[in-house]
Amino acid sequence: MTIRIAINGFGRIGRNVVRALYESGRRAEITVVAINELADAAGIAHLLKYDTSHGRFAWDVRQEREQLFVGDDAIRLLHEPTIAALPWRELAVDVVLDCTGVYGSREHGEAHLQAGAKKVLFSHPGGNDLDATVVYGVNQDELRAEHRIVSNASCTTNCIIPIIKLLDDAYGIESGTVTTIHSAMHDQQVIDAYHPDLRRTRAASQSIIPVDTKLAAGITRIFPQFNDRFEAIAVRVPTINVTAIDLSVTVKKPVKACEVNQLLQKAAQGAFHGIVDYTELPLVSTDFNHDPHSAIVDGTQTRVSGAHLIKTLVWCDNEWGFANRMLDTTLAMAAIGFRFDA
């Protein structure tokens, strides 16, 4: 069965979801029937075809009135600001991928369901009242048919959660800290301009900028046993894509750096293949652009202090890796069925 999806919000993640769908060869499993985006149709087509981070899309893209064509596939374009007014029932939408980065509450999810969608997947963290939060590769098996409003967590949560799980299972984590070194984002300024966060009033291309992060809460949402045992900070750096995460954890069992690397490399080749990758090459951030993994461990940067403090550096393409996980989670949601169809 082919899953019929609609995308609400066609920004960085929405466009990368479409690109990833076509590049990964999963069109027999997923069909995009509609895109809802307030921008004009010409702009939608142009930014899908040409991308500063990921290059020119290999597929032919054209726009005819309110239809977007990718190859021979026609996708209906909508410009509807009110979720409840979207024609999901008419279009027989199975799963809405809400990639606005704005909506994430149960109320917004239920509006999609009332419009006729069978299930909703948010591309960002949602509230505690959602049916589930999924980090694919770790907890997608906990999905149930009655889980209709789901969050795919965040790109950084998807990056770090598999590594935390591996280290905890092997050595027993007592506590940890996380520093996210994240590329600049759309909520920053090109030149100095007003913003409620005074640090984000400053030009994104000229400074390393500390910002707030809810990553510690995201870790606890997946692993409640770590409540009050993880802290996180984040800085934005003057690059346009790819993120590095510095993870430090204290563990119960004594360990050596080489043993940590052996554990993570084995996982990348085995149980976490396709989700986690491992490298010891002398690479930099641009080398991980367009990498589909959630996390790439840089084994050259692993350190252990006093046998119980582990430090690792983990890379991710915060756009491309996450877009691929959106597709994975969509398929997982569809595979368990639609118990409460609208």
Swiss-Prot record:
Subcellular location: Cytoplasm
Pfam families: Gp_dh_C (PF02800), Gp_dh_N (PF00044)
Keyword Hydrolase: no
GO biological process: pyridoxal phosphate biosynthetic process; pyridoxine biosynthetic process
Active site location: 155
Site positions (Activates thiol group during catalysis): 182
GO annotations of cellular component type: cytoplasm
E.C. code: 1.2.1.72
Binding-site positions, NAD(+): 12-13, 318
Predominant cellular place of this UniProt entry's protein: cytoplasm
Molecular-function annotations in GO: erythrose-4-phosphate dehydrogenase activity; NAD binding
Keyword annotations from UniProtKB, A to Z: Cytoplasm, NAD, Oxidoreductase, Pyridoxine biosynthesis
InterPro entries: E4P_DH_bac, GlycerAld/Erythrose_P_DH, GlycerAld_3-P_DH_AS, GlycerAld_3-P_DH_cat, GlycerAld_3-P_DH_NAD(P)-bd, NAD(P)-bd_dom_sf
Associated pathway: Cofactor biosynthesis; pyridoxine 5'-phosphate biosynthesis; pyridoxine 5'-phosphate from D-erythrose 4-phosphate: step 1/5
Annotated family: Belongs to the glyceraldehyde-3-phosphate dehydrogenase family. Epd subfamily.
NCBIfam families, per database record: E4PD_g-proteo, PRK13535.1
Subunit structure of this chain's protein: Homotetramer.
Role played: Catalyzes the NAD-dependent conversion of D-erythrose 4-phosphate to 4-phosphoerythronate.
Record's protein name: D-erythrose-4-phosphate dehydrogenase
Provenance organism: Klebsiella pneumoniae (strain 342)
